[in-house]
Amino acid sequence: MTNASTESFFNRSLADVDPDIFGAIGKELGRQRHEIELIASENIVSRAVLEAQGSIMTNKYAEGYPGKRYYGGCQFVDIAEELAIERAKKLFGVNFANVQPNSGSQMNQAVFLALLQPGDTFMGLDLNSGGHLTHGSPVNMSGKWFNVVSYGVREGDNLLDMDEVARKAEETKPKLIIAGGTAYSRIWDWKRFREIADSVGAYLMVDMAHIAGLVAGGVHPSPFPHCHVATTTTHKSLRGPRGGVILTNDEDLAKKFNSAVFPGLQGGPLMHIIAAKAVAFGEALQPEFKDYAAQVVKNAKALAETLISGGLDVVSGGTDNHLMLVDLRKKNATGKRAEAALGRAYVTCNKNGIPFDPEKPFVTSGVRLGAPAGTTRGFKEAEFREIGNLIVEVLDGLKVANSDEGNAAVEAAVRGKVVSLTDRFPMYGYMG
C-alpha cells in the first residue's frame, strides 16, 4: 500500500467506504428512534458502551486470561478484562467471574462442558413454559448431547410446579438442574431449587440472562448464595453489549469454567466487547441503576395492568419482573398476526408461545412484551399505560379486520401516536 492508500485506509469514513452499510445503520437508527421497543431481550446501550465496543481493542488477539496470555502486547487489554472481572464480581457479590463468553448460548455451553459428559442427565424449564433453547430443546445442542428432563408450569395458574421439579429430580437423579428462563414473569424460588438439587446431589445452575439487571438493581432476589453457578448475558436488562458472563463463588468450579471457555469452547476473546462489558458493569454499579431497575418493574406492572383492563389475558395474571406473556385469544388473534400488526404501528415485539399453546411455534397464541428498552428511554408508568392502550387499539382493530393485512386505518392512527410519543424521548442526539 502507498502512503496515500494507507492514509485513506485509516481515515476514510464508513459513509465514504460503504454507503450501503452506512445507509442501513442510518435506517436502523431511525427505526430505534421512532418505534417503541418492547422486545424483552433488547435494550439500548449508552454512548460510552458504544464507544468502547467500536474501539481499536477490536484489533487485539488475547488468547488466555489476564497475565497468562498466549500473545504479546496484551498489557492494556488486560486492564480492560481485569476491570470487567472485578466490576462483575462486585455487581453480583461473587468471588469469581469469567467475562469472555461471546454469547448467552456459549456461556451455557461452557457450563455444560465443565460439569457434564455427553449422555448425562440435566433438568431445565421446558421451552413451552418459558425456558430457553439451551435448556434442553431437542433442536439445540443441549437437547442432542444430553438426556434432558424438562419441568414446566401448572396448567391452572401458569406458575412453576415446584412439586413436579422435586418429583422429577428424585426420579431421574440429574447431574445438573437449571433454573431460569426467557418468558417467565414471576419471582424464582432459588432456595427451593437448591434444596431439590442438594436432595439428589445435583449442581444448581441459574440462567439469569433476562433478570440480571433486576438482580443487580436489587429488585429481584439474587441466586447467590443458593446456586453453584449463575450465567447471564450482558445485554437485556444489564444494558451492556451482547455477550455472556459466568459467575460462581466456588474456586474449583471457577477453574473448570475458565478451562471450558478457553481453550475448551472459544479461542481469542473479543476484547472490544469485554471493554464494553466493563463500561456497562461500571454503569450498573452507579446508584441511578437501582432507580432504573425499580422503574423497569413499575413500568412492566403498569403495562400488564393496562392490557388486562383492555380485555387481554396476561399469563400467570401479571408480572413481578420486566416482562410478560400476553394471551391473545380473547382478541381472536395469533402471535404472528399481532406481531405484524403492531410492527406496522411502530410497536416492536415478538410472537411467543404461551404455556400449553395450541398453535404452532411459528404462529403462537401470544406475544412477549418487556419494559427495559422503553425505561432506558425515560418512559415511566404513564407512558407504559399509554402504550398498553395503543396495543389494545391495534388488537381491537385487528379483530375487526380478521385478516393478515390488519386494519390499515387503525394502524396508521396508532403509528402517528407512537411517533408523537417517541419524539418526546429522543435518543443518541449526538448522532445527528
UniProtKB/Swiss-Prot annotation:
Taxonomic superkingdom: Bacteria
Cofactor: pyridoxal 5'-phosphate
Keywords: Amino-acid biosynthesis, Cytoplasm, One-carbon metabolism, Pyridoxal phosphate, Transferase
GO molecular function, one term: glycine hydroxymethyltransferase activity
GO cellular component, one term: cytosol
Site, as annotated: Plays an important role in substrate specificity: 235
Protein name: Serine hydroxymethyltransferase
Organism: Rhizobium johnstonii (strain DSM 114642 / LMG 32736 / 3841) (Rhizobium leguminosarum bv. viciae)
